[in-house]
Amino acid sequence: MPIQVLPPQLANQIAAGEVVERPASVVKELVENSLDAGATRIDIDIERGGAKLIRIRDNGSGIGKDELTLALARHATSKIATLDDLEAIVSMGFRGEALASISSVSRLTLTSRTAEQSEAWQAYAEGRDMAVTVKPAAHPVGTTLEVLDLFYNTPARRKFMRTEKTEFTHIDEVVRRIALARFDVAITLHHNGKLMRQYRAAPDKNQYERRLGSICGATFLQHALAVSWQHGDLTIHGWVADPVGAKQLPDMQYCYVNQRMMRDRLINHAIRQAYQDQLSDEQQPAYVLYLEIDPHQVDVNVHPAKQEVRFHQARLVHDFIYQAVMSVLQQASAPRLDMTEPETGKPVQWQQENRPAAGENHFAQPPRTTNSPSYSGKAPRTGQARESANSGYQPENPYQKKQDELYKALLQPTDNGASTPPSGIAAPSTVLHDSCPNRTATNTAASNNKQRALVESPLESQSTGFGRVLTVYPPCYALLEYHKGLAILSLPVAERYLKVVQLTPSEEGLRAQPLLIPQRLTLSKSELNVLSTHHTLLTRFGIDVFVESQRATLRAVPLPLRQQNLQNLISELIGYLADYQTVETQQVEPDALASWMATRLQSEQENWSHSQAIQLLADVERLCPQLAKTPPSELLYMMDIHDAIKALKHE
């Protein structure tokens, strides 16, 4: 048979073999076109599982009359024009194959109208050469696509279609995934004239959980942990189910990259690894996660159905997702403090905190604008997803809006710098008074005066923190309101002390975090001997180095070392351990090794922001309380404010 150019219809049918797998594929391609057109409402009508009819109607920008013929042509698109556009795709579609492929295996009709046109136009392709016919029609601004008799001219493909129920189930799943990706778009789904799904638009973030609950169910919502992390151009947000909820939701895995639904193995591996031993091998995590990344750093043109992507910095993306999910799960599983009085069993009244903005572990994330804390120790009974960073005690009674207002008022500093409990919330000392009702009136009055004095003028001995961060003096010094005075604190020194504590192993040792790509280490024979000699010590520090036949492979490191230059750090570590081997009577102490590594770690910050300083000091107060009580001179310096005051006095 001689070489010849295939007819357009046959070429399109071959292309349809990859694009149009089943009716659900048609729905996906057409709905994504509607989203690219800026539609805010999409109506989907299905008959007989999509075999008889698929109709997609939207209120997008529409297609002009002059472009209708090109819309049904192969490799014709308005999404990209140059190779540079292909390397930074921001639209759902970009190949220009969908409509041509679908029209070659069905009877497709395209009706559209733009806002500039006074009437709509309808186009359809037919014949061996796929000639396009255009005629006037009645239609509002937007586009309607009708796909009739799918695979009518390809009997082999039609034979492999499943039952009507099965095909509609696949369509329903596609619509669910799209509805989770675009909360701002209203979507309705009809099957055989019956309304099956109606997803109302949720333009406000406060309404996201309503759609999340309608798609994922109440079980997922009750076990959901909110995720919100940022690092450079990488942002991840969404929800993951705690291990208990994940065991009940085996098929709840939704992941999106720049609002594009994905089934990417790298992302799935990072999330699965974050759960680690909390799920068995046959169990799957449950999550709805949204990854935002610079379009130049991801290639979406690597899969026929665009269900997989290729990241230019795969290791960075993997570690970022892993750290975000793992931190949320660790915070949720952290032990809770007993917040009840031992005698009465009643919840302790709200008490003053030393820092309103204490403690969320951001991955170089700018501060949030939300000021309302939430308390969610276990799955909320109200059906609202928990905020992972604020997991704590949840009273038996549901958390009320009034309590939220009272608590926020408690955190607001007064003019004299002290926080006064609002009405309805007892001060810390009033709990003792309430538990001892049999007092005389005189004793009660004296006690109240003493309590008032304690609230208005807290003793210095009661201060267990660094005080309030007033500002940050560039690049790395924090000005503090400390012990009724002003103090300068070195943030790099505080960070070093914190890393020493984080790197000091407990009895169980530090948890090893597996690397996405194990690193081969080029070492001499003597260096390999050092690794073998101190293998137990390194394992206790969470450093997993596999030595075999004169080769070494670094497979895991503890969390504080993940972002370091591991090749250089391990080389310096071997030299440090080798120095100890030269003196036979000395052994490496874990505390000394932790201090040494902390001095070698590169700081993640060069120019500190106010929120980062608050976060660091909150972590230091929590993990190194002794530093706040008796700070060393290299960490904190008290300023003499009296000289400045004298300079302002004019006799």
From Swiss-Prot:
Q: Name one GO molecular function term.
A: ATP binding
Chain spans, region Disordered? 336-398
Q: What are its GO cellular component terms?
A: mismatch repair complex
Q: Where is the composition biased (Polar residues)?
A: 385-394
One GO biological process this protein is involved in is: mismatch repair
Residue spans crossing the bilayer: none
Q: Entry's Pfam families?
A: DNA_mis_repair (PF01119), HATPase_c_3 (PF13589), MutL_C (PF08676)
**Per its UniProt record, what InterPro entries does this chain match?**
DNA_mismatch_repair_CS (IPR014762), DNA_mismatch_repair_MutL (IPR020667), DNA_mismatch_S5_2-like (IPR013507), HATPase_C_sf (IPR036890), MutL/Mlh/PMS (IPR002099), MutL/Mlh/Pms-like (IPR038973), MutL_C (IPR014790), MutL_C_dimsub (IPR042120)
Is DNA damage one of the keywords UniProt gives this record? yes
Does the keyword Nucleotidyltransferase belong to this entry?
Answer: no
Keyword terms: DNA damage, DNA repair
* Xref: PROSITE patterns: DNA_MISMATCH_REPAIR_1
Task: Enumerate the PANTHER family for this protein.
Answer: DNA MISMATCH REPAIR PROTEIN MLH, PMS, MUTL, DNA MISMATCH REPAIR PROTEIN MLH1
Q: Which family does it belong to?
A: Belongs to the DNA mismatch repair MutL/HexB family.
NCBIfam families named in the record = mutl, PRK00095.1-1
What does the record give as the function of this protein? Answer: This protein is involved in the repair of mismatches in DNA. It is required for dam-dependent methyl-directed DNA mismatch repair. May act as a 'molecular matchmaker', a protein that promotes the formation of a stable complex between two or more DNA-binding proteins in an ATP-dependent manner without itself being part of a final effector complex.
What is the protein's name according to its record? DNA mismatch repair protein MutL
Q: Could you tell me which species this protein originates from?
A: Pectobacterium atrosepticum (strain SCRI 1043 / ATCC BAA-672) (Erwinia carotovora subsp. atroseptica)
Q: Which gene encodes it?
A: mutL
